[in-house]
């Protein structure tokens, strides 16, 4: 289930982005909805996703032909796919990954996002 709390319309968020970025976002959103109840909050430069308690577990920053995805877990994930890891608080790590093709939204990524979703509850 998807609930949208928005400050901007989808058209405002994607005005000059390519169809590639839009397609990646739509696929990511579809996969996130399989995790459970998702709240989508659209802002000027990013879109955040939270579980029912409104604690964000992932953020996307839209680029012209890709998406920069940041997600938070309670442990550090070691993978060459992850561009950076920031230790933001005790047992909170933000991981950044670049999504530039639909194949990047795979089982491994969804496992990580599932962990992030569960951590946010």
Regions found by a protein language model. Give the residues of each.
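Charge-dense, helix-prone N-terminal extensions
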Residues: 1-121
């Amino acid at each position: 289930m998807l609930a949208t709390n928005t400050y901007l319309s989808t058209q405002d968020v994607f005005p000059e982005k390519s169809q590639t970025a839009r397609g990646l976002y739509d696929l990511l959103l579809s996969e996130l909805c399989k995790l459970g109840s998702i709240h989508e909050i659209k802002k000027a430069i990013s879109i955040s996703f939270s579980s029912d308690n409104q604690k964000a577990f992932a953020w996307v920053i839209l680029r012209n032909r890709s998406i920069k995805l940041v997600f938070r877990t309670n442990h550090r994930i070691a993978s060459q796919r992850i561009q950076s890891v920031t230790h933001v608080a005790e047992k909170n790590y933000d991981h950044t990954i670049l999504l530039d093709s639909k194949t990047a939204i795979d089982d491994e990524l969804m496992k990580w996002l599932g962990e992030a979703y569960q951590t946010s509850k």
